[in-house]
Amino acid sequence: MSVRRRLAFVLLAWSAAAPAARAAGQPATATLSATISPQASLTLSTASLVFPDADPDVLNKVPATGGPVTINAKARATQGQAVVLTVLASSDLRSGLDVIPASNVTWTASGAGFVAGTLSATVPAQVATWTGSGLHSGSQQYFFRNVWTHPTGTYTTTLVYTLSAP
């Protein structure tokens, strides 16, 4: 191979390889974006509470059968913001035309952030509160105030739990 041909071959090979070599060393950037919105998830261990009949002289606070309601709350919230769990009775307890105020139902609580309270049909009662995102578990043991003056009947209402994470 002549010197000219060799030189032409080397120059051609070098010119073809040079852009690839320079491109391999060029930095590039990409933007990664993840949107994390406030979100909440709530699970209860039971969908019904039952208070058995009892003699008011023997038991003036009747515990719900089945033991405490276990509550699992998951929330994503803005850092430093409160996450609040409340419960509200849809109405007072009713049996036909007879009514027993929801305030005859109370609860004790266990678990970080959980508090004892009294049921209401007008104002949501606080069950628990936390700060920021997280997973929280606790329980409520419900009690019914058992007195001689309650009219007989089977009384019902619906409990509406609300978990809010701003």
Name the predicted role of every residue range.
Residues 1-8:
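Bacterial N-terminal signal peptides that target proteins for export
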Residues 8-17:
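Bacterial N-terminal signal peptides
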Residues 22-166:
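N-terminal small/polar-rich segments of proteins
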